[in-house]
Amino acid sequence: MLPRGIRNNNPLNIRRGKSQWQGLKAQQTDASFCQFESLEWGWRAAFYLLTRTYYINYRLYTIRKIISKWAPPNENNTEAYIQNVSRLTGIAPDETIGIPTIDAARWIAVGLAMAIQENGLSKREQNDACISFAEREDGRPKVNGPDSIDIFALLRGWTLCRQDG
């Protein structure tokens, strides 16, 4: 069975709340997490939260600070989450990620790594997702499958977020 975040088109498992996200399904059947019409809308919401709410409003500029708020220790193994995202991105936990409009690739990598963590992908699936972020050895992009994240939806979600001004 696909992970909950992928089934809900919500790769970072954004909790339901007051926000009326663009692209929400009209019928929300998950009591805890938002359900989006497509992965693009789920990624848009994720990148909006990361680059606007967390970066601009909360002034959280590092993996450690973002994840400590995103996945607090009372609900998660926060330090393991931080270390895994750092390992996957190559960005040190306390290193500034950068300005989203200038360092887009770093923010996209953080989002992808968080989705890998949130959706409990195995080491092999993590490697597949990271390979597909660029391209596979045969030169073709790895598109959506049961053991991958749809990288094209991720990039369209980033674009939707940036278009909102």
Regions found by a protein language model. Give the residues of each.
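Cell-wall polysaccharide-cleaving catalytic domain and substrate-binding groove, primarily
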Residues: 1-165
